[in-house]
Every structure is written in C-alpha cells, then in structure tokens.
Amino acid sequence: MNAQEANFDGLVGPTHNYAGLSFGNVASLNNEKSAANPKAAAKQGLRKMKQLADLGFAQGVLPPQERPSLRLLRELGFSGKDADVIAKAAKQAPELLAAASSASAMWTANAATVSPSADTSDGRVHFTPANLCSKLHRAIEHEATRRTLSTLFADPTHFAVHEALTGTPALGDEGAANHTRFCAEYGKPGIEFFVYGRAEYRRGPEPKRFPARQTFEASRAVAHRHGLAEEATVYAQQDPDVIDAGVFHNDVISVGNRDTLFTHERAFVNKQAIYDTLTAALDARGARLNVIEVPDAAVSVNDAVTSYLFNSQLLSRADGSQVLVVPQECRENARVAAYLDQLAAGNGPIHDVLVFDLRESMKNGGGPACLRLRVVLNDAERAAVTSNVWINDTLFASLDAWIDKHYRDRLAPEDLADPALLDESRTALDELTQILRVGSLYDFQR
C-alpha cells in the first residue's frame, strides 16, 4: 500500500527559556540563564515546517504542552491560588519552577517511539510515549503526550496509543531520538533499529561523565508491545565515550532513512557487527543498506555536537533522492561545511543540503531532528487524522499570526515568576486548540 513518512514538529511553547536543566546536554548547560526569545523560537520552527511542506513533504504540527505545570508544583507541596503557587515556588525553589515551566515538549523526537502498520503484528500504527524519566522537567510530559497522540490518532482501527513504560531508571525511555527505521519503501515491512546507552541487567560499558538515558530493557519492551518481528528488530549500543562528549541521544551522532544510515564512525559499540546485522536484516526485506560513515578525521565528535550535523533530517523525495536538513551551525563550522559540500557533490544518495536558522532551539540542544516525530502513514491512516494539523498556506498564516499575538520576544529566568505568564500561555493555548481543532486538550479547559 502507498505510504509516506510524515514529520510532526513540536510547536515551541510560550515559556521557551534557558534554565540549563539538562545535564549531559552541552548546549543546554552552556546557555543557562540566558534570555530567550519565545516568539523567534516558535517562528523559526514554524518556518522550517512550512518550507518542507512547500517542498512536498508531509508535515504536521503538534501543540505545546501547558506550562508552567501547576499540577507539578502542587504535587511538590506549593499551595494556594495559582499566582500564590508560582510566587512560593519562585521564592523557595526556583529550580523547580524552572522545571515546571520548561517548553521541552517542543522536541517531539522524544515524545514517543512510533512503529508503522507495515511492521506491527496487528497491522496498526503503534505509539509508545516516552517516559523521559531521567529528567524531572521531561518526566512530566508523557501523560499530555499520550492525550495529544490519542486525539490526533484516535481511530482504533488504524492506531494504538500505549501508556508510557513505568518511569524507573531500568526502563529509561527517550523515544524516537534513539530509534530509526530502514526499509525499501515506506509502505513495505522494514527493520526497526533501537539504540541504547546502557543495559540494566547485564554487564557492559557505560559512560562515566554523563548519564546514559536509554536502556536496552526499555527499547526491547517497546519493540515487544508494538508487536515487531524479532528478525526485523536490531539493537545497538551507543558508544559511552560519545555520551560523555555530549551525545545524550543517538540522533546527535547518527540518522537513518529508507536504506541509508548517515553516522559518525564513533557512534556505536562494535559498529561493524551492527552494520553487518542491519545489512543482513534489510537484505531479507529487499533492500541494501547504504552506510555513510563520517570519519573522525573529517568531523570530530566535538564538531558533531557543536554543529549538530547528525541531528538532521534525512528525507526522501518522490524521485528517490535524499535531502539532508541541517541547522545553520553546520555552515558556521568550517570542517562540517567542507564535509557537507563534499557529500552533496558526491555520488551517494544525499544530493542536497537544506540549511535552517533554528538558533533558539539549538541553544537548548535541539536541532532539526529533535523538533520532529516521524510517523509513516498509508493513505487510509492519513485520512483518519482529522484534526487541522497538516501544514499548508492557511494553517501557516493562522499559526504565524497566533504567535505574533500571544508570544513574548524576551523571557529571562526571573520572568518565570511572573504570574501573568501563566495567564498568557493559557489564553494562547485555548485559542490554539480551536485553530487545530483538537477539542479541550488541556487540563485548564476541562
């Protein structure tokens, strides 16, 4: 059956800020306490969505989550009216207010892991929201993520939206940022590739400086609940040394699409065995794996982390050629820029490189790949998505005007204590649910 890969980007929320909450994420730590520009952040992401939609790629949008999370703050012991809760948290534990105010749900690569119907035992598209249990500000996302996905992908004939895995370190799950899929064509059965940082119940190498957020056990559990064939599921361990260098998710060091794996030579433990396993598995599905391995001598791990070369989108055009979507930081690094020029001029599958200004997201450690959740849909499944979430001229204009109306152009850490920010955010989100036709999605609407 004809199928297409759709990218659902997270719309940056009104509380976008730089609180330095993500240990292991170098950009997040380096930009802690800087002033952010939520309006610019939202517009940068929206412009990427629109340009890709204009090029013929299926492009959807996912709404922000409500922030600050009064639910979290009340759970942590702050009481009173909403304004009192915010004031008490700001005075007594500003780090908790920052966690409750994070707009990190914008990075929808961490929202869930998705398996298309061609791969699953029951022939439905399966979603497992990521528990993101390694970070407080992200661990509060999965319930709202499940609600959003259940709203957009509501037809049980076509879709299965699961609960997140239990939020324990043994089942640490960071979603699609540690998952990719290889196939001959999107609508045909493929190979699902899960990358983990450590295993809870068996000995193996682990990072020493920064935490490994994804466990083997979590990846395996997601594969089992999605009903994936064992012979079409491949697991790989990310090299712990690159985690210690700031590669906190695998999508910071590799990206895959169709029959192509674009990766750094230091991405994986026992890389040749992984390449061989993927090659054999994909060969059984009628395709030949094409590995584009970037040597450390050309682009170092530090170059990869600072430029986010691999936190790129690798997209297939209708003619089968592939385009790489990268942040502008890749052009500002001389070694990375030179490599990209060589790549595009070569005889490989990647013929074009598109460059986007995503500076606001990048300063928090999120490039093009972080901002999108890939969902392969056949024609019937796409028709079952009835909300107004597909980017076109009309929706782009509505969202652009909505951002202009509701977003601040400066948000410093001390501004999180402003109770007006909650009211502004709720007003904006209430209007957004009408634009996207998603009903009463938020707790404050119920």
Curated annotation (Swiss-Prot):
<dbReference type="GO" id="GO:0019544">
    <property type="term" value="P:arginine catabolic process to glutamate"/>
</dbReference>
<dbReference type="Pfam" id="PF04996">
    <property type="entry name" value="AstB"/>
</dbReference>
<protein>
    <recommendedName>
        <fullName>N-succinylarginine dihydrolase</fullName>
        <ecNumber>3.5.3.23</ecNumber>
    </recommendedName>
</protein>
<feature type="binding site">
    <location>
        <position position="213"/>
    </location>
    <ligand>
        <name>substrate</name>
    </ligand>
</feature>
<dbReference type="GO" id="GO:0009015">
    <property type="term" value="F:N-succinylarginine dihydrolase activity"/>
</dbReference>
<feature type="binding site">
    <location>
        <begin position="19"/>
        <end position="28"/>
    </location>
    <ligand>
        <name>substrate</name>
    </ligand>
</feature>
<feature type="binding site">
    <location>
        <position position="364"/>
    </location>
    <ligand>
        <name>substrate</name>
    </ligand>
</feature>
<feature type="binding site">
    <location>
        <position position="251"/>
    </location>
    <ligand>
        <name>substrate</name>
    </ligand>
</feature>
<feature type="active site">
    <location>
        <position position="249"/>
    </location>
</feature>
<comment type="subunit">
    <text>Homodimer.</text>
</comment>
<feature type="binding site">
    <location>
        <begin position="137"/>
        <end position="138"/>
    </location>
    <ligand>
        <name>substrate</name>
    </ligand>
</feature>
<dbReference type="GO" id="GO:0019545">
    <property type="term" value="P:arginine catabolic process to succinate"/>
</dbReference>
<dbReference type="InterPro" id="IPR037031">
    <property type="entry name" value="AstB_sf"/>
</dbReference>
<dbReference type="InterPro" id="IPR007079">
    <property type="entry name" value="SuccinylArg_d-Hdrlase_AstB"/>
</dbReference>
<comment type="pathway">
    <text>Amino-acid degradation; L-arginine degradation via AST pathway; L-glutamate and succinate from L-arginine: step 2/5.</text>
</comment>
<feature type="binding site">
    <location>
        <position position="110"/>
    </location>
    <ligand>
        <name>substrate</name>
    </ligand>
</feature>
<comment type="similarity">
    <text>Belongs to the succinylarginine dihydrolase family.</text>
</comment>
<feature type="active site">
    <location>
        <position position="174"/>
    </location>
</feature>
<comment type="function">
    <text>Catalyzes the hydrolysis of N(2)-succinylarginine into N(2)-succinylornithine, ammonia and CO(2).</text>
</comment>
<keyword id="KW-0378">Hydrolase</keyword>
<feature type="active site" description="Nucleophile">
    <location>
        <position position="370"/>
    </location>
</feature>
<keyword id="KW-0056">Arginine metabolism</keyword>
